[in-house]
Amino acid sequence: MADPAGTNGEEGTGCNGWFYVEAVVEKKTGDAISDDENENDSDTGEDLVDFIVNDNDYLTQAETETAHALFTAQEAKQHRDAVQVLKRKYLVSPLSDISGCVDNNISPRLKAICIEKQSRAAKRRLFESEDSGYGNTEVETQQMLQVEGRHETETPCSQYSGGSGGGCSQYSSGSGGEGVSERHTICQTPLTNILNVLKTSNAKAAMLAKFKELYGVSFSELVRPFKSNKSTCCDWCIAAFGLTPSIADSIKTLLQQYCLYLHIQSLACSWGMVVLLLVRYKCGKNRETIEKLLSKLLCVSPMCMMIEPPKLRSTAAALYWYKTGISNISEVYGDTPEWIQRQTVLQHSFNDCTFELSQMVQWAYDNDIVDDSEIAYKYAQLADTNSNASAFLKSNSQAKIVKDCATMCRHYKRAEKKQMSMSQWIKYRCDRVDDGGDWKQIVMFLRYQGVEFMSFLTALKRFLQGIPKKNCILLYGAANTGKSLFGMSLMKFLQGSVICFVNSKSHFWLQPLADAKIGMLDDATVPCWNYIDDNLRNALDGNLVSMDVKHRPLVQLKCPPLLITSNINAGTDSRWPYLHNRLVVFTFPNEFPFDENGNPVYELNDKNWKSFFSRTWSRLSLHEDEDKENDGDSLPTFKCVSGQNTNTL
């Protein structure tokens, strides 16, 4: 019967790297037998006499050796043991793989014979717990290797901190007496793995504690927390845990292309390298963007990082960054941020000053800003370049300061406007508008509506002069004829006030006219005309009227020129006969034209109105002051900041 395929599994018959081979003796009957192979001869054992070790001879030989040879042998053994300790400490143990420990101990050749294809591709791990060199770190938490010696002397342990952990070894040696001995104590302590820290209930608290333990300062003392991950900022403070030494050394090179300023500190611990960064990026970034960037560059998990913006107004924090930046424990790249220089450099301390409200009021006046919120926002933006604005931000009464500034600015603006004539006011407004307008756009629009240009100029001249019975112009027409567009464009250019009849139930609905050079009432309806006919006849005449103003007694003033738009021609309607001679009516019968793209055919903007008034200046009888010299400004420059005396040496 044929033998079965394969092997029978008996010892020595498989393909294990070696084989049992039996000797084949070819001998026939009658052949001469060699004396060496005579099986009939008796074995007396005399041929093995030379291989027997005689203990007496060995002891005799040992006694004859010199003391120098014994010392040399013992010293060589001591050196071999010391080298072995270093190898076991710094070289990777062959038993690092737990699953292969048993096979490796039985026979290294068995592991070499493998029919499976092993993958040798390099795998990049975020956290790798390396073997310390003393055997199976995961199995043996504490291994003691002792060699008998005459004295037990311990030396301090040396620690090496790598990617996520390190090892600890103790070496002790001694000499004296009759013999030589040494003791090697190899102590493997349980390592605090960064992954185990992240699995705790409060990983951030553990990282904060470790940071304070290493750097001696609390991380929260250096940063101001951002609750939202979407909040953007250019300056960021970053603490990263569990970095490898090679990456920690290359951070400066990796981040230079992204930042303008870089401050790096790195310390080693049982978690690995802990790096503290102060970074000023080239553009504003949020926390999520920084996490994605650093997790790729530094090969660290976002959970192992604390990212917050630094404290910009803390002198203690600024001094910390300044002192560590000039020491040898930090690497610095780029120019120092201004918020550090402002609090640490002596010259910046000299430049600090107390807040002066007059400077803030002068700034608001020069920029024509009278709104509280706009003043607060725009003046705070000047803190980096304006010392008075910086002092304003340090004040604890910013709201009161802003309110006082806006109030004073409005007072100055109101007084300035009140002392100007209509000609001065139009010139003042023209100086604040760029050139390049076309006055013909306004003329063509009036002709399109059938308004004679010369009659409009005559009415406008009397309107601006405030002549009684000519102090009010009515733009009458159907819907969508451009009445409101024409009137609003003129109000915007002359910075007039607009009132609305919807507020007529209030006693103060006419208050905007008290501080205006020109006013407008848009879309007057029948109730509005009834109210005007009953209460505002003197106002339309341009005479003195009594007006109720908030927080002030009744104010007596002359009503400014008033422009009214309406779908009702009150100048001819029989319901209001007493308004007929008080209104100058212009009718707009045609619908306002637009081109195929939806843009107005006639542009009514500030530039065109400036060109219009400049072109018709003499026809409108607008005269400038005669004392104006060399085309200078007719109005002196307002200055509310007190003068400063020059110190003389």
From Swiss-Prot:
It catalyses: Couples ATP hydrolysis with the unwinding of duplex DNA by translocating in the 3'-5' direction; ATP + H2O = ADP + phosphate + H(+). A motif (Nuclear export signal) lies at residues 106-115. Residues 624-649 are annotated as: Disordered. Its EC number is 5.6.2.4. It comes from the Viruses. The keyword DNA-binding applies. Residues 186-352 are annotated as: DNA-binding region. The modification Phosphoserine is found at S93, S107. This is Replication protein E1.
